[in-house]
Structures are given as C-alpha cells and as structure tokens.
Amino acid sequence: MADRSRIRGFLREEHVTYASILLYITLSSGQIFFNKWVLSSKEINFPYPLGLTLLHMTFSSVLCFLLTKVFKVMKVEEGMTLEIYVTSVIPIGAMFAMTLWLGNTAYLYITVAFSQMLKAIMPVAVFILGVCVGLEIMSCKMLLIMSVISFGVLVSSYGELNINWVGVVYQMGGIVSEALRLILMEILVKRKGIKLNPLSLMYYMSPCSAICLFIPWIFLEKSKMDTWNFHVLVLSLNSLCTFALNLSVFLVISRTSALTIRIAGVVKDWLVVLVSALLFAETKLTIINLFGYAVAIVGVATYNNHKPKNGESITLVSQSPKNSDKKPDGPL
C-alpha cells in the first residue's frame, strides 16, 4: 500500500514537472509572437520597443513588490548589500534592459524566425567574453563547438532571402548585451557568493532596468507616444504574460535544473522558427536557412551538455563554497 502511494506521488510530481516545462515553452514562445504582434501589427500599431520594454520592467517591479512585501506569497533571498547592489545588480539590470530593448527593436526589421536563428550565436559571445574575464578556459573541444555554432549561424544568415542589416545590428547588439549580463551574473555567483533565485533577481533588477530604460525613453520615444491612442488592455496583458514567463522559469528551475531550461529553450527556439513560418507571410524559410540553423542547434545542444560539467550554471545561481562563510556587510 505504501509503495502504491509512493508511486502515485512520484507520478504526480512527474506530471507537475512536465506541465511546468510545457508552460515555460508555451509562455516563452507565445511572448515572442505577442511582442512581435504588438510592435508590428496594423491592429495595435505600437512601434515603440523602448516604451514596451519600459512598461514590462515597471510592471514587473510593481508585481514583485506586491508579491514579496505586501501579500508575502513569495520570499526574497537575503544577503544583498549596498556594495553588491551598486557594483553587480545595477550593471546586470542595465544589460538586461539593453538586451530587451535591442531585441524588441530588431522585430521591427527582421522576421521572428531569423531573429531566433541569430540568437543561436549566444554561446559563442558568452564563451569569448568568459575567456576575456577568466571565467572560461580555451580548449580544443570548446573551439570546435563554437566553430560549429558560428558556421551554422553564418549558413542560416546566408539563406535569408530578405535580410535587413539594421535589424541584424540591433539583434547582435542584444546578443552582446545578454552575454555581458550572463557574465556579470556568473561573477556575482562565483566571486561574490550571492544566492539569488530568479524571482529575487527580478525583484532587485527590475527597478534598475526600468530606470535605465526611462532615461533614453524620454529623449527617443516619449514625444512620439504622446499622441498615441493606448490599448491599455492589450499592453497590460502583454506585461502580465512577460511576468508570468519569468515566474515559469523560476518554477521549472525549482523543480528540475538549469540544464533542463537550456534543453527546453532549444525546443522552444525550433518551435518559434517553425510556427513563425506558418503565422507570418513575411517569413520564408529556405533549405539553407533550416540546414544552417540545425547545425547551429547541434552546437548549442553540445555546449549546453558540456557547460554544467565545467561549473555551476549561471541560470540557477547558488552560493560559492569559497565565500560561504563570508558574512554580508549588512542588508540593503
């Protein structure tokens, strides 16, 4: 009888885990199409990527505060100090803001599918920057993996029929910003020994990102948006979906591992590329596109399998053993 109860409990846990992974893939894929629709569609006509990103970060800041401080349904990890906040969290927040801003801007110029193909180059950017700051070690195996990914992205770009170099520049800028953010997060974990789950990170980071976006928004988009007729319901739902996506990452990582998120991310990328070809008339996939992207994804999958063996994942932050006895200077 006890064995049956244990089996039922195990199966129930397995179902919840698979459901959380499916939720993450659905929300992650859906949010990409939602953002593209809001920014580019004739129905909404909201071509303000900076304003949209600012709205997301402001919405996230308010919800994080309500969930952790007012309703107290979630707990923020302790150990944050003013010195760490200024030297680490603010730069991470700035890079996160830049990543979202440039990535959303790219949707105005290139297709969703091509954007996802370009994002496959991310491990290369992270590895190069990691070598520069001493977090990664150059090896023949890693060079081979990076070469495979780079070759695949180049081939998929060559196969793009309607390439827009302005969009490519924006997307590559977003990739570099995201790589810098991941490097800064790894430094925060390995060298400063700070333990932050994704929700805690969003709690500390969202206000910084919002402020970093607010300043350029005043000069670049505010005057254009003054005369725009806001679709409050659509933009609120878009912001809520973005926040739900961040919570789904927290849910998946808490039930599985950072490697699972990476594998789910690969599945999501393929899903986005294929679905975008069905949804958007502007997306025309070629055999060269798909071949190059397949090669890049093989490289990314190999990298994802290799990376956790060389150190703790930077997606799931954990306390460094080196600094586990170090006491914080004081609460923020």
UniProtKB/Swiss-Prot annotation:
InterPro entries linked to this entry: Sugar_P_trans_dom, TPT_transporter
A single Gene Ontology CC term: membrane
Pfam family membership, one: TPT
Segments of this protein annotated with the region Disordered: 312-332
Topology in membrane: Multi-pass membrane protein
Location(s) in or outside the cell: Membrane
Amino acid composition bias (Basic and acidic residues), ranges on this chain: 323-332
Keywords for this protein: Membrane, Sugar transport, Transmembrane, Transmembrane helix, Transport
Signal sequence annotation: none
Biased composition (Polar residues): 312-322
Transmembrane regions: 19-39, 46-66, 82-102, 120-140, 143-163, 165-185, 199-219, 233-253, 259-281, 285-304
Protein family membership: Belongs to the TPT transporter family. TPT (TC 2.A.7.9) subfamily.
PANTHER family: SOLUTE CARRIER FAMILY 35
Protein name as annotated: Probable sugar phosphate/phosphate translocator At1g53660
